[in-house]
């Protein structure tokens, strides 16, 4: 049966990203948010929100939901109005469309006919429908009706790591497989007006943005037709952090997606991340966390700061995560793939010897509901100039 399996590890062969055109500038967002939600009378809460935005280290975000949508659906700005139908009517259309845009960019970079795509993985926490976003994305792209699809709903911010793990398993166990893995989230699912009794809501309104990312994963790249690996996916793992139940969560209610984010999340991640690293890198003989490159989901500034401090990391280890957070906010599952894309582009622009900032080995981390940690040990490839 070995002839049915690929030889060697799976690699990321192409990356594509996409965002809605509408841009929200963070320094203007408190005024915008309280104006469109008709909450300008809540002056003290607005000042609290302004401080949250100022501390977020986010410069701008992309957002599908604009004022025209809010005028057409005025109930969306109410704090607890029954608006799930209106939200889903938008998102079941827009999530596959934005995902398709990211896929098209990945396929273009890959340079191969889309008929070679054998599997499609799609994850989103923004919407749920049957047939799913995977089906609609495949139709929009014109993929083969026999493409093997996997749809994963409600993973949240660790989903970028999950799609890589599953894509790796598929590619390595099906010789010749080329897996298109897509993450897309649009935060119209959780946009709503402020409440004095719901400060967690304000954090979500301050940090989340819309985005989609797609990767093509395959083993045994065929260089004769121009396939080039960007990163090798060496090993994967997932764990639930101890004493973390209820710290990150999302609940679909009549008012939309209600998001939970506990203040202890940065501490929980920073206190447990080294154990994840030791388990991942002991077989390779690596114990210096400054000797690897980092592709880290930037759930928020505090998470990056706490991990950096706990592991005594150099300040440049999270430069790509901080850049993506600044330019796009937290886009849930796709964010870590934006970071991967930024790392390989910056490595090329700065003349580094590898796609991993000049380092051979690296790690990708996703953090999300559970509190779940998804990690991938990644190996860079040399850059040929």
Swiss-Prot record:
TM region positions: none
GO molecular function: acyltransferase activity, transferring groups other than amino-acyl groups; lyase activity
GO BP terms in the entry: cannabinoid biosynthetic process; polyketide biosynthetic process; terpenoid biosynthetic process
EC numbers: 2.3.1.206, 4.4.1.-
CDD domains: CHS_like
Pfam families: Chal_sti_synt_C (PF02797), Chal_sti_synt_N (PF00195)
Matching PANTHER family: CHALCONE SYNTHASE (PTHR11877:SF14), HYDROXYMETHYLGLUTARYL-COA SYNTHASE (PTHR11877)
Protein name stated in the entry: 3,5,7-trioxododecanoyl-CoA synthase
Gene designation: OLS
């Amino acid at each position: 049966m070995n002839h049915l399996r690929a030889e060697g590890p799976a690699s990321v062969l192409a990356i594509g990203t996409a965002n809605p055109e509408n841009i929200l500038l963070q320094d203007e967002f408190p005024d915008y948010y309280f104006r469109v939600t008709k909450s300008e009378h809540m002056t003290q809460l607005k000042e609290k929100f302004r401080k949250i935005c100022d501390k977020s280290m986010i410069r701008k975000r992309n957002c599908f939901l604009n004022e025209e949508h809010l005028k057409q659906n005025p109930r969306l700005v109410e704090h607890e109005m029954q608006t799930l139908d209106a939200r889903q009517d938008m998102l079941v259309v827009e999530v596959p469309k934005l995902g398709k845009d990211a896929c098209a960019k990945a396929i273009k970079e890959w340079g191969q006919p889309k008929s070679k795509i054998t599997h499609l993985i799609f994850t989103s926490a923004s919407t749920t429908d049957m047939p799913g976003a995977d089906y609609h994305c495949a139709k929009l792209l014109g993929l083969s009706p026999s493409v093997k699809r996997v749809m994963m709903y409600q993973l949240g911010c660790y989903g970028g790591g999950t799609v890589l793990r599953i894509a790796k398993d598929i590619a390595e166990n099906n010789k010749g497989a080329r897996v298109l893995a897509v993450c897309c989230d649009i935060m119209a699912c959780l946009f709503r007006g402020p409440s004095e009794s719901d400060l967690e809501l304000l954090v979500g309104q301050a940090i989340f943005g819309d985005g989609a990312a797609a990767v093509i994963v395959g083993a045994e790249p065929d260089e004769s037709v121009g396939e080039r690996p960007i990163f090798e996916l060496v090993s994967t793992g997932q764990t639930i952090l101890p004493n973390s139940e209820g710290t990150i969560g999302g609940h679909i209610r009549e008012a939309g997606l209600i998001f939970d984010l506990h203040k202890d999340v940065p501490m929980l991640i920073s206190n447990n991340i080294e154990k994840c690293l030791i388990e991942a890198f002991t077989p390779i003989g690596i114990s210096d966390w400054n000797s690897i490159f980092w592709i880290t989901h930037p759930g928020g500034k505090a998470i990056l700061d706490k991990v950096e401090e706990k592991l005594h990391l150099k300040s440049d280890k999270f430069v790509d995560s901080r850049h993506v957070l600044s330019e796009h906010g937290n886009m849930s599952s796709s964010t870590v793939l934006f970071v991967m894309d930024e790392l390989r582009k910056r490595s090329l622009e700065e003349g580094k010897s590898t796609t991993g900032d000049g380092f051979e080995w690296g790690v990708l981390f996703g953090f999300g509901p559970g509190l779940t940690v998804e990690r991938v040990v990644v190996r860079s490839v040399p850059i040929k100039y």
